[in-house]
């Protein structure tokens, strides 16, 4: 059997039917003896299908694995043992700074556009080929090819990596995300009726050949089983100096993407979602499931007709776009006008002014770990059109609150949730990101369900959701944004003076009624802050002043309540959430950190720090004294004040 010829034919195939034709034409592939259950489990159906609930979510699992592969390769190349915590980066963001390029906190928003494009085009590509049908009625689906220039695998290692459902290969590696070892198989049930998925890989050091295998749903009736192809128990191997994994819609090889090592995964007739068949739709599906990609991607759609007038890739029928995730799309509008078929509506609409993200609050809980909550506001457009990008409009998505780990969305909450928190007026003017990346490792396993889309309804899940909601409800920054939007809406009512507009706005935000003067039918607008009064903080604070009541008396804290210290400071609003030289809350006594859940909110020079007992050994009458303040790596010393807490009996 000519392994190389078969592999290249499969790579060039652009439909499930074409793959089946290849199988039927090759005696070795038609022989059931050369197919075995993935992970040697005849019951692997339960694992394969009990993962992502949509094709878009499943695809982003693959993209996460691609980023892991790049970081792993760079670690190996620099002589770093990924499992040695004394030398390996402690998280993905620090891994980007140390192993790839210093982005001052590992954030893509700090990178130059030229570097982002160059890195993505050489390392992380998603190609869309095959069917050009984009209507919901069509039964045809495109193919997706995922190409990464990462660590790759030897053929002999496929069974313990790509073909494993249970081996925790990355569980001891602190700077990768794909620790569940299931993300690669989660796409199978979205690959047409036969679950065809091709994997080709070569180890990054080129010390061995390429290996390849094809996965499929076992033909015949009975319990569904996911199989993989082998030859006499061995993964087929081929020799090739370079691999060109993508083809133009004419069938010609595309020379613009080439691998000498790394991994290619091709999904045939991939069902990303009924409304996501178009190129824009694919990017929208990815955006909603990745708040950030950690490393830059390039997505290329090969299904266009060649347009010689436009030149570049469009002359070859290819539309290529950068993809960096939700946060980047909302904060920085990327333009590739020479390649656009239309406006980039998955990003902020043209004419929209997108504000920098702001802090909602930070939680440091000894039983859970650290949680950072930020908001991405969307300001009004000068032309009066909807400021929401298309993929966030409620006709496409109701999701507004995104719980993420290393950029990968684990759980979503809706517009209704924001209304329930008292923010109905901004439910279509903000996206909130709950960054749970710094939760304790044990918390992750107690919090997220195996599908990584839901939260377990146990003590950990209930505690997590409760403290997150408390921070959102208490957020002065969200309240200020709500007031700004209310002023905009009331101004529109007063200016346009139409009953229809008034009714529409009040229907969407019942809180507007409270802002109207009931004694006078004339609308009165709340006075905005004068420009001279706008708060301008400092990168590093120069003062931290405790509220006067705490200068001479302790914070009295019931065992079953949370109570807060208040302070004033000149720290800038993003002191705790910025990527570059992130500030920290200073607590002098580590025993206090270990025994109390601490939540803090900083906004316009006002800092509120909530303490609540989290240790069962704390008793009424206990007394704690320590220093509380602010610190960052660029400050010569922390700014602190002495504080004390007196524990009281539980309150009714």
What are these regions, as identified by a protein language model?
Residues 1-132, 136-139, 156-163, 506, ...:
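Bergerat-fold GHKL ATPase/HATPase_c domain
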Residues 1-26, 274, 333-652:
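Charged regulatory segments coupled to nucleotide-binding catalytic modules in large multidomain enzymes
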Residues 40-51, 144, 173, 261-274, ...:
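Short hinge/gating elements
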Residues 74-87, 175-180, 298-305, 481-489:
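Short, glycine/acidic-rich hinge or "gate" loops at secondary-structure transitions
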Residues 85-120, 214-248, 324, 329-354:
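Charged, glycine/proline-rich intrinsically disordered loops and linkers
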Residues 143, 160, 170-323, 652:
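GHKL-type ATPase core
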Residues 148:
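Acidic ATP/Mg2+-coordinating residue in the GHKL
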Residues 152-154:
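A short glycine-centered beta->alpha linker in the GHKL/HATPase_c
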